[in-house]
Amino acid sequence: MQPMTARFDLFVVGSGFFGLTIAERVATQLDKRVLVLERRPHIGGNAYSEAEPQTGIEVHKYGAHLFHTSNKRVWDYVRQFTDFTDYRHRVFAMHNGQAYQFPMGLGLVSQFFGKYFTPEQARQLIAEQAAEIDTADAQNLEEKAISLIGRPLYEAFVKGYTAKQWQTDPKELPAANITRLPVRYTFDNRYFSDTYEGLPTDGYTAWLQNMAADHRIEVRLNTDWFDVRGQLRPGSPAAPVVYTGPLDRYFDYAEGRLGWRTLDFEVEVLPIGDFQGTAVMNYNDLDVPYTRIHEFRHFHPERDYPTDKTVIMREYSRFAEDDDEPYYPINTEADRALLATYRARAKSETASSKVLFGGRLGTYQYLDMHMAIASALNMYDNVLAPHLRDGVPLLQDGA
């Protein structure tokens, strides 16, 4: 007879925010046993953070993660697992040896053009400079950007950064890649304008561990779902699967590979107390190979970090090769056509095998953390809870 401990009511593949939200809700709200399987040696997906050993400074291993949302339900939900600091994210942009206030606003415009502009004067200036190209006539990303903010600002702050991000001349990128380039006609340089913002007081990993702390949740690290599903599913034949890994990988790339961008990081401990005076500095010029530098001490000024050492991380962007970590969907027309075929496969997999697909990788969408959590709460409410509680048949939500 199958021992009770081996039986589960739900399998969750991946322990990022989507997977952990599903696991936590199903375990605590429905009193169900959940097994979370994680390929990596740690919990939390790309939100994982750890203390750098020499300094104790918390480093976001997969690039800076800033929590912000205007969704009250998400904010109330996440505060069950962590308190938040009052951190407000601000970014600066390095161009030609000068650091500019970012995003584009009165601070940047006044700095860049060498004198103060009132909101009205700045609007007029940018309208005049953008008049060079009509947005409707823009044939590529470069022309579209110039039609929105004018050539001087485009060449200083968009051209090089975009070329580095996409490894492609902006003249070769489709105009549709950008819908808007917002300019704020105020001195407000908060990066996000959401109602709620902050960083988890004890760090991301503590928050993620708290989400998985319920005794009805088991997390197995260093475990690839595709290696163990043949053993696990027969022992719990009624248990659905929530899969948050790459959508194309699930189907063994049968239709081809979806395109992603990846990031490379260089972490360095420097023998100084402060390297750049701010958490994130964008490097907008093409002659600098990285896109930005993170300095993690500035995320937590309330912490007692060493005054003689600091940790920086240089970030580089490139197209993902087969074995790279996927970060951002490229979303070309070919990708979208491929996605439609995989979505159709996902829908039939849900119907035939009780597998649901969610999260950034599982849906081929760029999701901020709060969006992944909101999406998981919706899947729980509309699909999983009705199925596990009332026996309603599973349907891939939104497919």
Swiss-Prot record:
GO terms for molecular function: flavin adenine dinucleotide binding; UDP-galactopyranose mutase activity. GO terms for biological process: Actinobacterium-type cell wall biogenesis; capsule polysaccharide biosynthetic process; cell wall organization. The keyword Flavoprotein applies. The lineage of its organism: Bacteria, Bacillati, Actinomycetota, Actinomycetes, Mycobacteriales. Catalyzes the interconversion through a 2-keto intermediate of uridine diphosphogalactopyranose (UDP-GalP) into uridine diphosphogalactofuranose (UDP-GalF) which is a key building block for cell wall construction in Mycobacterium tuberculosis. It catalyses: UDP-alpha-D-galactose = UDP-alpha-D-galactofuranose. Its cofactor is FAD. It comes from Mycobacterium tuberculosis (strain ATCC 25618 / H37Rv). Keywords: Cell wall biogenesis/degradation, FAD, Flavoprotein, Isomerase. Transmembrane segments: none annotated. UDP-alpha-D-galactose binds at F157, T162, W166, Y191, N282, R292, Y328, Y366. FAD binds at F18, E38, N46, L66, D224, W225, R360, L367, D368, M369. It comes from the Bacteria. Homotetramer. Belongs to the UDP-galactopyranose/dTDP-fucopyranose mutase family. This is UDP-galactopyranose mutase. Pathway: Cell wall biogenesis; cell wall polysaccharide biosynthesis. Coiled coil: none annotated. One of its GO terms (cellular component) is cytosol. Its EC number is 5.4.99.9.
